[in-house]
């Protein structure tokens, strides 16, 4: 292997960035090559630009020397591949140093940030300013990148949950080293650059999400006003067959605009993994979790197979009362228990949580936490990531890092029509195949929009156990293939599945290939990432 181009590129990177921001350290590279499932791609170096101008310079150097780059924001894309590139030999270009908040407008409710800004940082910024605005947060670690998640089209909680639909004015460094501004942002002094999604002419923003056509170095994100009043609601389903009827009800409510916030369902396997770890001793070392033990663990939330929840975000108590009445009328006949928790109920729950848990096993502290620290209010939470430690035998450390701690976690995220029939079919496939492979099917169903349900399947295991990586990936692929055969395709892919989609029946691959060859003729930017190159026609065509 000729290493001279790489060595020359590294020397040029050091000249631009400084030695401290170009790392070939073996331990740093090994950490960047590690995900929450087995990977094989190797990383020769990690470079860390601190500005868009330095990103431009790095891209030009990479192109000059024919060295591929793989951009990451903070690298916490856990469950989908973390920081590991989609091709072997790519240099990781970390944007974590680019963590400035560049513009903020309280009146028009937007913020412009760099890709290194985390959820924790942005929420603290808003709180420190006494802002009335909030961010739609995700279930990932608060230290994950806001821009990175949006560029992978992740969903959040609350209003603006479809985060990709609430951005504009993106700044992108193209693979030739030039800089592009989308929408009205391309015009100096444009007054609507940060508040008008489309601009004038072809709308280009989507080209730079789930793609390798450019590096996003700045993004404007629309925020939502923090509600003057809020109330959470949750319900239990003892019989999982009721999920289908409840799906139809939630869809009809969402089509009417109620509630404005997202609604979610979580199955029992998902809930137990968020609340604790696998009971290895009680299960006598066997997997998957025995039904009797699952039933015992369910008591923490009243024995239900599924738990659902959402929030009413309102300008007045009268509005809350009106929305509550509509939601109650729709859901009550179809669920086992429907509860609404406002300020007064949360206060009572706080007083009664110990005696109630002692007498019934039901944990009211969860109710209090759900009201006071609801993600629907733009408050990040870490419990979802702690579920990555479900099958680990050691307790999660205070500072979680699933990559470092050899947690096994693979996310599968099919998009499904919001009808009971479709959601029920998809859930049965996931449950049956996961259990057949001896894994617990941890499932969330997120209703962030009116017509489509996003199902997130979490397959958890311990990477330190021999053979588990292979078994987990076989389970993942089995579920992936069976869902795809029914037309339930993922809205987001891990690095291992970039070529796993069914064959397309249109010229999509031809167009994507033409764009890639035009913008990145040297193929130096994240080769293989969401470019579906197996569908490209030959270059001479």
From Swiss-Prot:
* Matching InterPro entries: Cytok_DH_C_sf, FAD-bd_PCMH, FAD-bd_PCMH-like_sf, FAD-bd_PCMH_sub1, FAD-bd_PCMH_sub2, FAD-linked_Oxase-like_C, Oxid_FAD_bind_N
Show the PROSITE patterns listed in the entry. FAD_PCMH
Task: State which pathway it belongs to.
Answer: Antibiotic biosynthesis
A GO MF term? D-lactate dehydrogenase activity
Question: What's known about how it's activated or inhibited?
Answer: Activity is not affected by the addition of EDTA or/and EGTA chelators or in the presence of external metals like Zn(2+), Mg(2+), Mn(2+) and Fe(2+). Activity is inhibited under low oxygen conditions.
Induction data: Encoded within the chondrochloren biosynthetic gene cluster.
For the keyword Flavoprotein, the answer is yes
Q: For this protein, what reaction is catalysed?
A: 1'-carboxy-chondrochloren A + FAD + 2 H(+) = chondrochloren A + FADH2 + CO2; 1'-carboxy-chondrochloren B + FAD + 2 H(+) = chondrochloren B + FADH2 + CO2
Q: Does the keyword Flavoprotein apply?
A: yes
User: What name has this protein been given in UniProt?
Assistant: 1'-carboxy-chondrochloren decarboxylase
Read off the PANTHER family from this record: ARYL-ALCOHOL OXIDASE VANILLYL-ALCOHOL OXIDASE (AFU_ORTHOLOGUE AFUA_3G09500)-RELATED, D-LACTATE DEHYDROGENASE
Function (record text): Oxidative decarboxylase involved in the biosynthesis of the antibiotics chondrochloren A and chondrochloren B. Catalyzes the decarboxylation of biologically inactive pre-chondrochloren A and pre-chondrochloren B to yield mature chondrochloren A and chondrochloren B, respectively. Cannot decarboxylate free L-tyrosine, 3-chloro-tyrosine or a number of chlorinated and non-chlorinated analog substrates containing variable N-acyl chains.
Q: What happens when the gene is disrupted?
A: Inactivation of the gene results in the accumulation of carboxylated chondrochlorens A and B (pre-chondrochlorens) and abolishment of chondrochloren production.
Q: Name one GO biological process term.
A: lactate catabolic process
EC number(s) stated in the UniProt entry for this protein: 4.1.1.129
> Which EC class is this protein assigned?
lyase
**Species annotation:** Chondromyces crocatus
Keywords, ordered alphabetically: Antibiotic biosynthesis, FAD, Flavoprotein, Lyase
Give every FAD-binding PCMH-type domain span.
Answer: 39-226
């Amino acid at each position: 292997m000729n290493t001279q181009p790489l060595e020359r590129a590294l020397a040029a990177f050091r000249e631009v960035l400084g030695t401290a921001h170009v790392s070939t350290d073996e331990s740093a590279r090994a950490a960047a090559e590690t995900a929450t499932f087995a990977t094989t791609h190797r990383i020769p170096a990690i470079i860390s630009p601190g500005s868009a101008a330095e990103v431009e310079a790095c891209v030009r150097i990479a192109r000059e020397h024919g060295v591929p780059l793989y951009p990451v924001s903070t690298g916490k894309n856990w469950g989908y591949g973390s920081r590991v590139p989609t091709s072997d030999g790519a240099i990781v270009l970390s944007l974590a140093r680019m963590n400035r908040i560049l513009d903020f407008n309280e009146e028009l409710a937007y913020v412009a940030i760099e890709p290194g800004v985390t959820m924790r940082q942005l929420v603290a910024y808003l709180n420190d300013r006494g802002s009335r605005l909030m961010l739609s947060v995700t279930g990932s670690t608060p230290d994950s990148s806001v821009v990175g998640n949006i560029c992978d089209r992740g969903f959040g909680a609350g209003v603006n949950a479809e985060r990709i639909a609430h951005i504009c004015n993106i700044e992108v460094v193209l693979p030739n080293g030039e800089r592009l501004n989308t929408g009205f942002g391309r015009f100096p002094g444009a007054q609507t650059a940060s508040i008008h999604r489309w601009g004038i002419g072809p709308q280009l923003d989507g080209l730079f999400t789930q793609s390798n056509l450019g590096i996003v170095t700045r993004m404007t994100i629309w925020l939502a006003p923090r509600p003057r009043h809020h109330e959470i609601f949750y319900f239990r389903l003892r019989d999982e067959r009721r999920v289908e009827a409840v799906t139809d009800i939630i869809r009809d409510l969402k089509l009417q605009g109620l509630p404005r916030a997202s609604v979610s369902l979580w199955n029992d396997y998902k809930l137990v993994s968020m609340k604790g770890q696998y009971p290895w001793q009680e299960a006598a070392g066997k997997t998957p979790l025995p039904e009797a033990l699952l039933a015992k663990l369910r008591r923490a939330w009243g024995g239900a197979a599924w738990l659902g929840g959402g929030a009413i975000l309102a300008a007045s108590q009268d509005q809350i009362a009106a929305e509550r009445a509509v939601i109650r009328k729709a859901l009550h006949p179809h669920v086992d228990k429907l509860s609404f928790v406002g300020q007064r109920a949360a206060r009572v729950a706080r007083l009664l949580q110990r005696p109630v848990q002692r007498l019934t096993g039901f944990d009211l502290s969860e109710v209090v936490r759900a009201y006071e620290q609801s993600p629907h209010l733009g408050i990040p939470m870490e419990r979802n990531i702690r579920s990555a430690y479900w099958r680990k035998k050691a307790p999660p450390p205070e500072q979680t890092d699933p990559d470092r701690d050899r947690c096994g976690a693979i996310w599968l995220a099919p998009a499904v029509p919001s009808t009971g029939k479709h959601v029920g079919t998809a859930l049965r496939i996931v449950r049956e195949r996961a259990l057949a492979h001896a894994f617990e099917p941890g499932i969330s169903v997120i209703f962030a929009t009116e017509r489509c349900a996003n199902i997130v399947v979490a397959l958890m295991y311990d990477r330190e156990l021999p053979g588990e990586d292979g078994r987990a990936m076989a389970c993942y692929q089995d579920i992936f293939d069976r869902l795809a055969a029914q037309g339930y395709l993922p809205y987001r892919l891990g690095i291992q599945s970039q070529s796993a989609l069914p064959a397309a029946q249109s010229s999509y691959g031809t167009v994507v290939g033409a764009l890639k060859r035009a913008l990145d003729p040297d193929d130096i930017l994240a080769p293989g990432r969401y470019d579906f190159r197996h569908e490209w026609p030959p270059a001479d065509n």
